[in-house]
Amino acid sequence: MKLFFKTYWTYFVSFIIPIIIMIGVYLSQGIYWNSDTSPLLGDGFHQYVIFDIALRNILHGNGSLFYTFTSGLGLNFYALSSYYLGSFLSPLVYFFDLTNMPDAVYLTTLLKFGLIGLSTYFSLNKLFQSIPKPLKLALSTSYALMSFTVSQLEIKTWLDVFILIPLIITGLHLLITEKKILLYFTSLSILFIQNYYFGYMTALFLIFWYLCQISWDFKTRKSSVLDFIVISFLAGMASLIMTLPTLFDLQTHGEKLTEVTKFQTESSWYLDLFAKQFIGSFDTTKYGAIPMIFVGLLPFILTILFFTLKSIKFHVKLIYAIFFAFLIVSFYIEALDLFWQGMHTPNMFLHRYAWIFSTLLIYTAAEVLNRLKEIKIWNFLVSLFLIVTGFLATIYLKSHYSFLTDLNILLTLEFLVVYSLLLLAVIKKFISVNLFAILISLFIMVDMSLNASSQIDGIAKEWGFASRSSYNRDIPAMESFSAYIGNQFTRTEKLQTQTGNDSMKFNYNGISQFSSVRNRSASSTLDKLGFKSSGTNLNLRYANNSILADSLFGIQYNISDSPIDKYGFKDIYQKDNLTLYENQFSLPIAFASQSVYNDVKFTEHTLDNQASFLNQLANVNFDYFSPIPYEKTEKIENTNDLISITSSSNEDAAIQYQIEVPENSQVYLSFTNLHFSNDKQKKVDILVNGEKKTFTTDNVFSFFNIGYTKEKKTFNIHVSFPGNSQVSFESPTFYRLDTLTLTEAIQKIKEQPVTVSTSKNKVFATYDVQQDTSIFFTIPYDKGWSAYQDDKKIEIKQAQTGFMKVDVPKGKGTITLSFIPNSFITGAICSFTSLLLFGIYNYKRKLYKV
């Protein structure tokens, strides 16, 4: 053991230094194991930790890796995992639970920073054996803590990419120089499997990087071209077990390619390259950001030095310069910026390929440190002049970079002086190389620690680390409800949600969803039926819809912290401040239509769509919704078809109405084109006969449940808009839903019973129908679904674009739906074939050598 540690102690140090620094950086935010402040912020809170919880439940036997019903009516979990869960460390979530999952995020994030340091040190040690170990440790720490990784740590699966990149670079070097192909093939295959998005960028990077590497000795290294092409292809092929189903899912449900509408990228300016080389510089991770390229001040200095060294041939410098120039130009030209990102505009976290620039800086700096004794005074002075000129120009014109503070400038100039003095000292041989290595490594650790702390401060101010209490809110009650509901294959929705993925967090089947991986066909259809999912369908929300939609989509349970006043919903269980309500009129997740189902045409009118959809299913022609006349009790201002309400003094804008409601009515208030003067406050408070209801308008329609009455009744309604002195909207409409008519239509569908259950990635629907009909599944249509009856495959048809139906004859039967991601089997065969071909190719190469 002592011998092992003596031999490999630097590997341990390369792993532990980034972890220690990040522990300190986290601590500065009050974050540690089981701390009151969690390590969750932004998407980390709303998405990543929740998907970790879903994976944990699956690993414990509750669910399938292929499909989940806890999001968006149903979702291809395999495709979601390829984007959000691709990590070596994802299986560790098995050992955590819902309550302490933030600690899993804390632990795995620290481990990933450590593993980046370790893999980078391994790479530098293989490629540059003559560089003193402290310098390699300094560079590996710089890479682990570069601005790109720290500022975007909430997207924690991105960190895994940088564990693999140094291994891929090392593998490519071994392929070129020693004809060894295993490391390159293995590491590249794993990257493609873990993260197809960064895999695409890496593939582009490797083309340029390969040209850079063969330029060092073209005559000898050109023979590696065939190996590079074949092994890269086989690595891509080996990943098809994951990437092929994902690509087909993206083809069906992904966003359209972004059109290039302008020449220059947003917010870019001439000195961006220097502005982001100031220690601690942080602008934003939202829109209008310039690239996160800082990887330490010293690598930047050494990269400039690289182009002045005589021992490096001109054509090598030229190839490297072209690569650097192409990257820099890409930061400015919209078309190239999109090209690196697959022709898709990122939803914040811009310039996602900026890590390539940082990677280039590290490995170019290593080339210079490998030639430390060759550096002359004039090399250093030329480089220093260029750097100082760039920094001074940026300082002089810093009005263009409002994020640069005096502290950023002071720290950068101080470290620039320190690095310059140390470089001068080693060039003039005032100090030994070993002493230089130790001293400069210590300063680099401080440099990167300060920068990491600044990045964390930046994202904390921008997104805010969630408190542990906020994360834990409602967990005991929700777990109690989950136990009460049991394993019923029904749907549940929580009315006061914290995230768009609460159903996945608390492990109940629901509608709401917030994910880049989604079934856009289903979401678009649901949008027309009142569950808002506009634009690219990134969000889908349950709130602010009708009880008719509840019935159609099998919402059997509602959870609320206040009375919900919905027809058919009865309170059945209470825990803490939450109450569980059961819907007496919900349909099962699969039900029989009255005849073979034919699509109805949807319009832009949500309630008309709901009515025509239910009528088609029940084979009736009922009117469910009708407007209710109302009286305004206050004067309001009408301009351009908009009603504008302005409050006096500091009061909230408010308006009052009075309506006469017929018996057996569920009442709704619809605002169209509702605009708030305060975009940060978008809630609506409604008092109905003195009883208060609060609604959100965030990512949902402005369609509010006023309440249910069995008898004829007068509703006095007071609508206020907290935090807003002025609001405007089109003339509102009060709607009455006839509950007797709704009940009749739902009962007519229930006359032909269908019993539904599920197991893993299968759904079982047992039916008894009196005529030829369709079994309608309110499950998103996906080509991964197959239907079987009596061990024979039967046809699944799309219904209303987003859903599924299976036509069946009169009688009894059971339909089994099975989900295997589209092209999964083909991808698995390709992956197995790739491994076989790799083995054969490697064997033939060895045979050829012999």
Give, region by region, the residue ranges found by the protein language model.
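Periplasmic/ER-lumenal interhelical loops and adjacent helix-loop junctions
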Residues: 42, 46-47, 53, 88, ...
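Active-site-proximal, structured, solvent-exposed surfaces of multi-pass membrane proteins
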Residues: 2, 631-850
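Membrane-interface coil-to-helix junctions
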Residues: 11, 15-120, 141-162, 201, ...
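Contiguous transmembrane helix-bundle modules in multi-pass membrane proteins
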Residues: 198, 322, 326, 344-470, ...
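Extracytoplasmic/lumenal acceptor-recognition loop(s) of multi-pass membrane glycoenzymes
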Residues: 443-464, 483-552, 587-588, 592-604, ...
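Membrane-interface micro-motifs in multi-pass membrane enzymes
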Residues: 78-83, 102-115, 135, 142-166, ...
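Start-transfer (signal-anchor) and selected internal transmembrane alpha helices
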Residues: 1-31, 434-435, 440, 836-850
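Membrane-embedded helix bundles of polyisoprenyl
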Residues: 109, 113-127, 133-176, 180-215, ...
